[in-house]
């Protein structure tokens, strides 16, 4: 079986940070949801965010989008609050946990929503990019399907194509701008093959200079695909480092309240986590 080639670094790569979070705090009605969150993401890095349900993972991502506030977050070297929404949307895209649609849009029209930040009017190039994005997620030929007739997993892949179209690199540009992709549980509705296809695609984007932050629940997917793992517990960062450094029995049991065994994967260069109870 083919071995996965993955960077193994204990610290972030040395390039300029795409995302910097410093002492981020967030409370609602006196309840502390995030406390002193600090980390950074650099170009070409895939950072997996792990934690129990309610640990603060999605709240953290909603801060990175600016939905819950813009303090404590810098992107591309500037405070988040200094960006116009349209300017930021051309360089940072987010795929939330759920994107419910109640209207019978054609699939291609949904993907074309990702091109809105790039111009007021739809162009033939936009449609070409949208079709290419659908092909990247395995949905070529779905362009004129009613999205409400698709399975949950297929709909999730349509929205993944939408954010791909949003960040699509211009092949004519002499230099590609730095970009960030935020994924909140991107594999939650997917079968095994498409879970791996989605994260392989994320890794491919990393080779193109995109920084990816992905909230995941599957520890083994994080072990296989992430450069670094950030564990959130009770709204705090309790561990941050390579999968080998972070995904240990002691750290996992403390974060998730479940005993595990960790062994070298028999086929891949990464840890393998199995339940021990």
From Swiss-Prot:
It is a peripheral membrane protein. It is found in: Cell membrane. InterPro entries: AAA+_ATPase, ABC_transporter-like_ATP-bd, P-loop_NTPase. Keywords: ATP-binding, Cell membrane, Membrane, Nucleotide-binding, Translocase, Transport. Its EC number is 7.6.2.-. It is an enzyme of class 7 (translocase). ATP binds at residues 51-58. Signal peptide: none annotated. Gene3D superfamilies: P-loop containing nucleotide triphosphate hydrolases. Its main location: membrane. It comes from the Bacteria. Residues 19-259 form the ABC transporter domain. SMART domains: AAA. PANTHER family: HEMIN IMPORT ATP-BINDING PROTEIN HMUV. Part of the ABC transporter complex HmuTUV involved in hemin import. Responsible for energy coupling to the transport system. This is Hemin import ATP-binding protein HmuV. The gene is hmuV.
């Amino acid at each position: 079986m083919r071995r996965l080639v993955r960077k193994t670094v204990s610290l972030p790569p040395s390039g300029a940070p795409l995302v910097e979070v410093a002492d981020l705090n967030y409370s609602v009605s006196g309840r502390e949801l995030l406390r002193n969150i600090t980390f950074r993401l650099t170009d070409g890095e895939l950072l997996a965010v792990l934690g129990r349900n309610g640990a603060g993972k999605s709240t953290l991502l909603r801060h990175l989008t600016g939905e819950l506030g813009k303090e404590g977050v810098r992107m591309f070297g500037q405070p988040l609050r200094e960006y116009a929404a349209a300017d930021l949307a051309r360089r940072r895209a987010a795929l939330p946990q759920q994107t419910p649609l109640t209207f019978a849009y054609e699939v291609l029209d949904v993907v074309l929503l990702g091109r809105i930040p790039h111009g007021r009017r739809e162009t033939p190039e936009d449609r070409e990019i949208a079709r290419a994005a659908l092909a990247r997620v395995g949905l070529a030929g779905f362009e004129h399907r009613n999205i409400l007739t698709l399975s949950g997993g297929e709909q999730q892949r349509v929205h993944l194509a939408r954010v791909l179209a949003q960040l699509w690199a211009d092949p004519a540009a002499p230099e590609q701008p730095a970009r960030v992709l935020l994924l909140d549980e991107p594999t939650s509705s997917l079968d095994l093959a498409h879970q791996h296809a989605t994260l392989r695609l994320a890794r491919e984007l990393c080779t193109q200079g995109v920084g990816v932050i992905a909230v995941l629940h599957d520890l083994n997917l994080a072990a296989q695909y992430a450069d670094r793992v950030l564990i959130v517990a009770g709204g705090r960062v309790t561990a941050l480092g390579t999968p080998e450094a972070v995904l240990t029995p002691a750290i996992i049991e403390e974060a998730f309240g479940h005993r595990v065994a960790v062994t070298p994967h028999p086929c891949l260069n990464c840890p393998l986590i199995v339940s021990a109870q």
